[in-house]
Amino acid sequence: MRYADLCSVTEPVVSVITPSLNHAKFLRATIESVAAQTYRNFEHIVIDGGSSDGTVEILKEYPHLKWISEPDDNVLDAYQKALRLARGRYIIQCCVSDGFLAPGWFDKCVDLLGRHKDVSLVWALPQYMSEDGALLRVSYEGFLEDPPPQKEDFLSFWLATRFVLPEGNYCVRASVLRENFPDGNAREHYRIHCHLGFMYNFMTRGYCPLFVPEVVNYGRFHAGQRGQRLQAEERPAYKKYVNDVRLYAGQLFRGEVVHVFRDGESAVTSTVDARASRRIRKDYRKHQLLQSRLLRTAPYVLFVKFRTKVRQVFSAKTER
């Protein structure tokens, strides 16, 4: 039997959840990239939204999968179904058109989360892929040479940049994901874009991420992908998320909220007092400056833009 070892898993440590809707073209590659992981104590759950393109026939080819196929109310509904089915201690999300490049990623996540009790989420870098399978640029490639802050120090970076962790590879403690993932009572923009809601809750409730400077998964560009289909809804949701982070930063620095840090069991490990708040604010300003467009633009490009602007001004004056 194909993947017989995965069929025999009864107490999975890792649960992989994959929402799916009419993307049979990419489904086999996604399933097999997950099944190629060196770590074998995992389950793979596919929540199909009632596809009509042959998806179900493909799912039946893989006896190790746990899957259902029925209409979903929305993306959030699909993820909530998956969370109810997941039995693992840790959860990884993998969209139906995406997959993994690093076969040792699950191994690394289980090891790191086992050794770092203060960490609730492990993440790395994704790489874009074309519809026909050609690898393109690496997202956030600069982090390979200049990694973002780790654990508690990530808070100031997040407040300054509103950075959203790449959900296509991060591995989260299941209890933390369930606690912080939006449900039907969440604010509307977090029901629309549930990963933003998780990110906001995860950070404001004091959980800590750990970055691994490796490229571990691919995210595929293709016609009809979620980002294209839902752009009109998700872009306003993202703007509201950015505003929420900005408001939280202001409340924290004015002393209107008390921020605590938590370990992977949700226990409070420390509280941000006035002294710590000043340090976080100092780091916040540093990250704002370092991540500014001005410093991330090559000097020659800035010079050309400045020269062009000057010429436009003088040209306008001459025309008058």
Where are these regions (language model features)?
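N-proximal low-complexity "stem/linker" segments adjacent to membrane-targeting elements
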Residues: 1-33
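Conserved nucleotide-sugar donor-binding catalytic segment
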Residues: 16, 124, 143-238
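Short, acidic, metal-binding catalytic loop of nucleotide-sugar glycosyltransferases
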Residues: 32-41
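Short beta-strand/loop segment that forms part of the nucleotide-sugar
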Residues: 41-50, 68-71
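A conserved acidic beta->alpha catalytic loop
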Residues: 48-57, 95
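Glycine-rich, basic loop-to-helix element that forms the pyrophosphate-binding segment
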Residues: 70-86, 96
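Short aromatic/hydrophobic "clamp" motif used to bind/position activated sugar donors
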Residues: 91-92
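Conserved donor NDP-sugar-binding/catalytic core segment of glycosyltransferases
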Residues: 104-138
